[in-house]
C-alpha cells in the first residue's frame, strides 16, 4: 500500500471514529492490502508472513476466473493507529457460490468461517484507489458478476 492510500484510510478511519459514524465501508485491492512486506496492514491477525497463504488462495480463484476482482474490506485501526485491520475478502466473480466455497475450502488451515453472496449494497462503500482517491463501488460492478464475501473470524 502506498503512502497516498495510507494517508487516505488513516484520515477516513480516524474521522469515522471521532464522529462515531461507521456507515461507510472502505475497500482496497487485495494486492495493495495483502502486500507481505507492508506491516501497516493486518489480515486475520497475520501482519507479514501469514499473508502469503491468503495471496495463494486468491490467485487460485483468479486462475479459475480471469475476470474476478478481489478486494479487502477494512474495519478498523489498532496499535495506536499504526495498523489497519481486516478479515473479509470481497469477490466479484462469474463463478457460482458453490464454486467459490469449494475454492476457499480447499486449504485445510485457512478456510473462512463464512462465505456468502453480498446482496445488500445500501451502505456507502468506496475503494481506496492508487492515488488515495475514493471510487464508489457502483463503478466496479459488472452485470455478469456476482459479489461474494469471505469472512474469517
Descriptions of predicted regions:
Residues 1-108:
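Long, contiguous N-terminal structural blocks used for assembly/anchoring
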Residues 105-117:
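Metal-dependent nucleotidyltransferase catalytic core
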Residues 114-153:
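Acidic, proline/glycine-rich low-complexity IDRs
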Amino acid at each position: 500500500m502506498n503512502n497516498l492510500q495510507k494517508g487516505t484510510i488513516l484520515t477516513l478511519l480516524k474521522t469515522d471514529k471521532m464522529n462515531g459514524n461507521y456507515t461507510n465501508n472502505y475497500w482496497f485491492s487485495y494486492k495493495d492490502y495483502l502486500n507481505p512486506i507492508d506491516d501497516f496492514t493486518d489480515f486475520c491477525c497475520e501482519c507479514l508472513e501469514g499473508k502469503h497463504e491468503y495471496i495463494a488462495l486468491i490467485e487460485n480463484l483468479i486462475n479459475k476466473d480471469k475476470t474476478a476482482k478481489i478486494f479487502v474490506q477494512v474495519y478498523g485501526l489498532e496499535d495506536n493507529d499504526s495498523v489497519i485491520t481486516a478479515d473479509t475478502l470481497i469477490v466479484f466473480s462469474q463463478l457460482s457460490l458453490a464454486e467459490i466455497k469449494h475454492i476457499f475450502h480447499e486449504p485445510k488451515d485457512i478456510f473462512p468461517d463464512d462465505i456468502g453472496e453480498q446482496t445488500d449494497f445500501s451502505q456507502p462503500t468506496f475503494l481506496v484507489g492508487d492515488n488515495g482517491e475514493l471510487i464508489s463501488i457502483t463503478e466496479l460492478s459488472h452485470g455478469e458478476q456476482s459479489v461474494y464475501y469471505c469472512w474469517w473470524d
